[in-house]
A protein has these predicted regions:
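Transmembrane helix-bundle core of multi-pass membrane transporters
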Residues: 146-241, 268, 290, 294-296, ...
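Loop-to-transmembrane alpha-helix initiation sites
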Residues: 145, 172, 221-228, 269, ...
Length: 390
């Protein structure tokens, strides 16, 4: 081959086109939206970006974020889980009953009271079990995820009501003689007591830079935020660094191809619904702990919030595309938007309209991105065919 032919055969670097810019902006839309929301409300309210308000927002975001993490796994497989809100309510009632009433064993004539950590583990296991039932129904009987989880929504809510005949389990503080104290700390406790941090900040305020006092304030982050961070890290690692995560994406991208490649699709689906149930159980525990009470109506409409944060984060409802980081950003968009509107005095009725509009806009943008990616893929295929003909 001559030098001229060799030079001609070398591919020229592709130019950065306007389409590339549009795709980049679409992929980063969640991050851009969060920055815009923060910038707008920081301008409208000086108190919006204070450490104290950020901690409050983060603790509120933790609920939607943890639910969203479980929902992300499900939606990545092109599924949906409408039962997560009811499962959260059911698990809250299970935990409340175990703390206040214990486990009654009529055949032995005894009542067993569990340590608070055992209550937490049993409750989480029950959440995962409900998820496993969802996954089994979907895979074994070929029921669509929408119908299967819609049915479980009613079943779980009914079981939550039956657990206490529709009554609330109040005052979930436990008793020293039963060794089940400490449950309220799960939802509102901190690694360092806020009173200590407050004293340190007060003592340092006159001598230390503002940055130091702000960092000290963040030491009072509640356990719920740290739990959210832990769930986020574990979920992100599982999805991006393990064969299981790659199989989840493969199923959502093309389930038939995934089956032909040897992936045990049914097994993976059951596991992702178990993860969703586990996350819902964690949310139920956090809410019951924070309120120091368990109510059977806990978690109503939470499934809609979970779907919203996943969609806002850029995960495709068609499956196969999305990530945990985007879901967390989506949760913070909803949290920052809600907190900001309250701080500037937006009517609660208008808040619902605005949040709903944002979600619809996010879905529209997601569809635009999907269409653009298809168009780009088609153009690339055409260029390859032309190059092959030459």
């Amino acid at each position: 081959m001559s030098q001229v032919e060799s030079a001609a055969s070398i591919k020229k670097p592709r130019k950065f086109t306007m389409t590339d810019v549009q795709q980049l902006l679409l992929q980063a839309r969640a991050y851009i939206a969060l920055v815009v929301v923060i910038a707008v409300f920081s301008f409208l309210s000086e108190a919006f970006l204070t450490p104290a308000n950020i901690i409050i927002v983060a603790s509120q975001v933790a609920i939607n974020a943890i639910l969203g993490i479980g929902m992300t796994f499900v939606i990545l497989t092109a599924g949906i889980d409408l039962s997560v809100g009811s499962v959260a309510g059911l698990i809250a009632m299970i935990a409340g009953g175990l703390i206040n009433e214990g486990l009654v064993l009529p055949m032995f004539g005894v009542i067993v009271y569990f340590h608070v950590w055992a209550v937490i583990l049993i409750s989480l296991a029950c959440g995962a079990l409900v998820g496993a039932v969802n996954g089994f129904i979907i895979t074994r009987f070929n029921v669509t995820p929408f119908i299967a989880t819609l049915g479980m929504l009613y079943v779980a809510r009914g079981l939550a009501l039956l657990r206490s005949d529709g009554n609330t389990y109040p005052n979930l503080v436990g008793k020293p003689e039963f060794g089940n104290e400490g449950f309220p700390a799960l939802g509102s406790g901190t690694f360092l007591p806020s009173s200590w941090v407050g004293d340190w900040v007060h003592n340092l305020s006159g001598s230390a830079p503002k940055l130091v006092t702000d960092v000290m304030t963040f030491l009072a982050l509640p356990y719920s935020v740290w739990i959210m961070i832990a769930f986020t890290i574990v979920a992100a690692v599982v999805l991006t660094k393990t064969p299981f995560g790659r199989q989840v994406y493969a199923i959502g991208g093309n389930e038939r191809a995934a089956k032909l490649s040897g992936i045990r699709v049914d097994r993976i689906k059951v596991i992702v619904y178990m993860i969703s149930g586990l996350c819902a159980g964690m949310v139920g525990l956090l809410i019951a702990s924070k309120l120091v009470a368990a109510h059977p109506a806990t978690g109503v409409f939470f499934e809609l919030n979970a779907i919203a944060v996943v969609v806002l984060g850029g995960t495709s409802l068609m499956g196969g595309r999305g990530n945990i980081g985007g879901t967390i950003i989506g949760a913070f968009i909803i949290g920052a938007l809600s907190a900001g509107m309250v701080m500037v005095g937006v009517s609660s009725f208008w808040q619902q309209v605005i949040k709903g509009s944002v979600i619809v806009l996010a879905v529209i943008v997601d569809q635009i991105q999907a269409q653009m990616q298809k168009r780009v893929a088609l153009q690339q295929q055409q260029r390859m065919e032309l190059a092959a003909q030459e």
